[in-house]
């Protein structure tokens, strides 16, 4: 696969699971002889939701909830066929969204 790169984008709500999955992908790629660029942390997306604490009155009493989406990007430069096979067989933790672009 000469001159081709694989870009892997990872998303998760928990940064610890995301980092462990990233380490697993990097070690698998390096073990099969590919060069890895990254992991590059992307900006964390924070969604905030504001709701009333009471269902009836007290408009001034509110509560805020937030959801943080952590993201990482990996580039695998000049992957070998063994690298692609190993990445396809890799079983990552639940809760990690993986996007792969060739």
UniProtKB/Swiss-Prot annotation:
One of its GO terms (biological process) is translation. GO terms for cellular component: ribonucleoprotein complex; ribosome. The keyword Mitochondrion does not apply. PROSITE patterns: RIBOSOMAL_S10. Keywords: Ribonucleoprotein, Ribosomal protein. The keyword Flavoprotein does not apply. Transmembrane segments: none annotated. Belongs to the universal ribosomal protein uS10 family. Part of the 30S ribosomal subunit. Involved in the binding of tRNA to the ribosomes. This is Small ribosomal subunit protein uS10. It comes from Methylobacterium nodulans (strain LMG 21967 / CNCM I-2342 / ORS 2060). The lineage of its organism: Bacteria, Pseudomonadati, Pseudomonadota, Alphaproteobacteria, Hyphomicrobiales.
């Amino acid at each position: 696969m000469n001159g081709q790169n694989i870009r892997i984008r990872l998303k998760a709500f928990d940064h610890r699971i995301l980092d462990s999955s990233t380490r697993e992908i990097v070690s698998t790629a390096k073990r099969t002889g590919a060069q890895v660029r990254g992991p590059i942390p992307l900006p964390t997306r924070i969604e905030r939701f504001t709701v009333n604490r009471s269902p009836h009155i007290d408009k001034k009493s509110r509560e805020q909830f937030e959801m943080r989406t952590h993201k990482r990007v990996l580039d695998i430069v000049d992957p070998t066929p063994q690298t692609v096979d190993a990445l396809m067989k890799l079983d990552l933790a639940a809760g990690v969204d993986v996007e792969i672009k060739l």
